[in-house]
């Protein structure tokens, strides 16, 4: 990609608020403290065992941008990185729905496209790694997963490869179809117990974690965005979501070298945890069901969200650095000279957005729009301030009254109309 194309790509994504593609490294200013701490956590995960982290910020103040910066930090340190934004379709209380979306946005270091196929396809069926993997899967995972790996690594049917790989990424292969593939490959019947995606999804997570370490990568970073959407679930859904967060914090849902990172809105504590009294009620809802493990995990998950590290506002110096990069990109993208510096553009933006709590996203888009207008018209845009907003009566009565004053005859009903009534 040329320098001009790269600059235009950055500007279009900044205008729209959509994160850059994972392969494009973002600009990062004012986050050195958090990234240094996360770098230490990555070292610990690679050398010892899993850790967890949560960060909080207001909407539009850079949570997703910081996650993308961590994405690149982890990738540079030989970590596999997965990203998922919670939605109505992928709620945190349903890990069976989370898993396929998570794997669909999983990148190996240096990869231009997502996916985990390379973790398996690079294994030789007769290699010690393959034998170790199959033996571990036989004793530690659901028999279905062992059968999938057995057929994938040692089976003779190449037609089934895509189907078997698809199951590792989406959990969508039925046991009946797996038995058919197994009989084709080995001419023997496969005995496999019932598989439940909701119950056994943990084994898929454990398998990916094992494959990552087996193939020589440092570990696995999982980035959860929009965690505040947990607050839109019902009370049971919220309790289960907190428990899953807690399980990821306690032991990574049975994984070894994993760093889950949760990005949550800063008002989640007051608007959800306090207002709905989830700190007390959520563990109680699980206790009624007699699940002591879930109760402890729920408390741990709530504590993690309570202690989320708050993103600090960008300083004027950070803004000037960021805006200087923005000016350079804009001038490179459209081959012109603005005559502005990061400091002068910051003064213009700050004069318009005087509120101290103005969103980072608002100021950034304002700066881009200023440069766009300056480039298009050759002069700085004129700023008009509107003082006061009044209510406007949009009902039909005032218009009808005004019409009656202008033309009384038109407003009076005709005789025919009276007869019809």
Label the predicted regions.
Residues 1-51, 380-421:
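A short, basic N-terminal segment
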Residues 2-6, 178-341:
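The catalytic "switch" region of P-loop NTPases
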Residues 7, 108-145:
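Electropositive, surface-exposed helix/loop patches at the edges of structured domains
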Residues 73-91, 307:
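Conserved catalytic segments around the Walker B and adjacent sensor/switch elements
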Residues 93-114:
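Conserved NTP-binding/hydrolysis module of P-loop NTPases
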Residues 158-181, 297-421:
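C-terminal alpha-helical "lid" subdomain
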């Amino acid at each position: 990609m040329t320098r001009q194309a790269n600059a235009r790509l950055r500007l279009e994504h900044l205008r729209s608020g959509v994160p850059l593609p994972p392969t494009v490294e973002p600009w990062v200013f004012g986050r050195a403290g958090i990234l240094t701490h996360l770098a230490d956590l990555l070292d610990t995960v690679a050398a010892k065992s899993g850790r967890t982290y949560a960060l909080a910020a207001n909407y539009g103040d850079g949570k997703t941008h910081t996650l993308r910066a961590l994405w690149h930090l982890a990738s540079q340190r030989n970590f596999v990185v997965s990203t998922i934004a919670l939605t109505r379709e992928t709620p945190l209380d349903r890990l069976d729905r989370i898993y396929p979306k998570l794997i669909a946005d999983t990148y190996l270091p240096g990869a231009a496209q997502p996916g985990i196929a390379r973790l398996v396809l690079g294994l030789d069926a007769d290699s010690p790694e393959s034998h170790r993997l199959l033996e571990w899967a036989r004793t530690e995972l659901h028999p279905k997963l062992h059968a999938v790996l057995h057929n994938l690594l040692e089976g003779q049917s190449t037609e089934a490869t895509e189907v078997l790989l698809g199951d590792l990424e989406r959990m969508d292969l039925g046991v009946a179809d797996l038995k058919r593939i197994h009989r084709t490959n080995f001419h023997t019947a496969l005995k496999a117990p019932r598989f439940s995606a909701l119950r056994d999804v943990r084994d898929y997570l454990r398998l990916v974690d094992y494959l990552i370490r087996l193939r020589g990568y440092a570990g696995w970073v999982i980035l959860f965005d929009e965690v505040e959407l947990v607050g839109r679930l019902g009370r049971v859904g919220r309790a289960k979501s907190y428990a899953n967060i807690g399980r990821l914090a306690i032991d990574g849902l049975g994984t070894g070298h994993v760093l889950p990172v949760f990005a949550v809105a800063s008002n989640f504590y007051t608007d959800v945890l306090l207002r709905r009294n989830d700190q007390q009620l959520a563990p109680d809802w699980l206790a009624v069901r007699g699940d002591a493990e879930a109760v402890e995990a729920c408390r741990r998950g709530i504590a993690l969200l309570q202690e989320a590290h708050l993103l600090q506002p960008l300083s004027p110096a950070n803004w000037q650095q960021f805006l200087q990069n923005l000016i350079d990109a804009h001038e490179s993208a459209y081959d012109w000279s603005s005559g502005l510096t990061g400091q002068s553009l910051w003064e213009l933006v700050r004069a318009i957005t005087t509120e101290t709590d103005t969103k980072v996203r608002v100021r950034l888009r304002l700066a881009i729009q200023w440069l766009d207008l300056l480039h298009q018209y050759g002069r700085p845009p004129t700023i008009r301030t509107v003082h006061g907003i009044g209510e406007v009566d949009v009902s039909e009565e005032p218009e009808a009254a005004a019409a009656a004053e202008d033309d009384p005859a038109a407003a009076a009903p005709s005789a025919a109309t009276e007869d019809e009534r």
